[in-house]
Each structure stands twice: as C-alpha cells, then as structure tokens.
C-alpha cells in the first residue's frame, strides 16, 4: 500500500489514494499501522475513496488511531488538499472534500495556507452523545469534577466538541480530566474535549483531547468549536487566532448562521509503501 505521511501543526495523518479500491483495510491493520513504535504512527488515517473530476469533488473516509471512524477532520481535509496538489490530482486551487454527511469547500490562499469552509456551528449535542436525559439538547452543562465546578460548552461542527474555558491552559491533569469525562458515562459515544484560554479579543490558546486518538498537537475542528464558543458566548472578534503548541490556525466567522472558515498550513513529510 502506497501512502503519504502529512501533518498540520503536528496533527499527523497517513493519506492513501484508494480511488481504485485496491486497499481493503481492516480495523486490526489500522491499529497496527497507527502504532508509533512498530507501525507508521498517526492521529488519523484518511482514505480518498471517490473522485468526480467535473466538480472537483473528493469523497474521503477518516479513521482514528483506535480504528473508529471519524466524520470530520478539518486538519485532515487541509492535508488531503495538499496531497491532491502534490500528486497533481487537481490543477486549480479549489476542491470540495468530504463524505456522505457533507462537503467542505477547500482552497489555497494567496500566502499558500489552506482554507476549509464548514457549515455553521451548532450549539448543542444531540441525545445519542449524552447519556443523561437532562443534558440532551443543552448548550452547556455544569459538572462538579475533582471538587471543582466545570462548565462544558457543547458545539457541533460536523463532530461533537466539549469546550472548557480555563486560565490554566497547561493544566497538568488535562489528560486525566478528559479520560474521566469519557469514562464516567457522561458521554457514552465519546466526545472531543478542549481546554481554552482566552488571551485577547482575537487570540485563544487551545489544548485538545480527540476521541479515538487521545491528546493531539492540534485539531482543526476543535479550533472551530472553541472559536465559536469564544465568539458566541464571550463576544470575541469575528477573526480569531487559535494557538497550539506548534503554531496557529485562523478562524473567521462573519456572523452567527454563516459558514465558518478555518485557515492553516499543511505539510508533506514523506511518501512510503507498506505491506499488509
């Protein structure tokens, strides 16, 4: 199987052109492949499954490192776009990339960053995510965890997110907190969890724990969700810089109800080939 290793601010991917359907990849193989010591290592594996040349439409499948399927990955879409450019599968600076749940208009900016446009964020999580009926269709809930009250803001940006606002972005127990939230039947189908520190009216800092992959270096959909919370609840500017440990993403949301743009880099690391 031929593949390309790519990343966006350290959020790394293995991307496979599977349009000819030659690669029948099993969950066991995905887990083996994702191992950073005995495999290739990645946060997500992305298969390009279908291509409509007339409309520049590419259908993809996204798998987390634990082999569970993901239905949104903005950093991944950005890397797929760069893959398509490198492999000369597209000539223009625009493509529509997504799955059966929807497409994202993706384009190259003048300064060689990649912009992904997504549907308007939705400020609640549906009942299949939350186990307790009193939490269903809520915009936010307050939980008491480790003797502290924590406000969880819910946002759906193609996948579900829980955003926690804290001044202590380097919270040492972030991984412990995330695992607690995921294992204590609050979110039976799991959820992406982020801690956000608001630094200015146009700047936030983010730490992310992705469902199916664990703590990652960056996450495009988390950046979108956190920016949505910052704009909607805290009245931040419509253009926000989202800082991760390895760099920045930029989120632009003109107004509530409009599509949202997430802008950032995508980098090719190497090409390879591996046997099943």
Swiss-Prot record:
Which domain of life, per UniProt? Answer: Bacteria
Site-annotated residues for Important for dimerization: 270
Q: Where is this site: Could be important to modulate the pK values of the two catalytic cysteine residues?
A: 161, 210
Q: Name one GO cellular component term.
A: cytosol
- Database matches in Pfam families: DAP_epimerase (PF01678)
Q: Which reaction does it catalyse?
A: (2S,6S)-2,6-diaminopimelate = meso-2,6-diaminopimelate
Q: Which InterPro entries match?
A: DAP_epimerase_AS, DAP_epimerase_DapF
Q: Which GO terms describe its biological process?
A: lysine biosynthetic process via diaminopimelate
Q: What is its main location?
A: cytoplasm
Q: Where is the active site?
A: 73 (proton donor), 219 (proton acceptor)
EC assignment: the record states 5.1.1.7
UniProt xrefs under HAMAP family: DAP_epimerase
Per the entry, what this protein does is: Catalyzes the stereoinversion of LL-2,6-diaminopimelate (L,L-DAP) to meso-diaminopimelate (meso-DAP), a precursor of L-lysine and an essential component of the bacterial peptidoglycan.
Annotated protein name in UniProt: Diaminopimelate epimerase
Q: Which organism is it from?
A: Wigglesworthia glossinidia brevipalpis
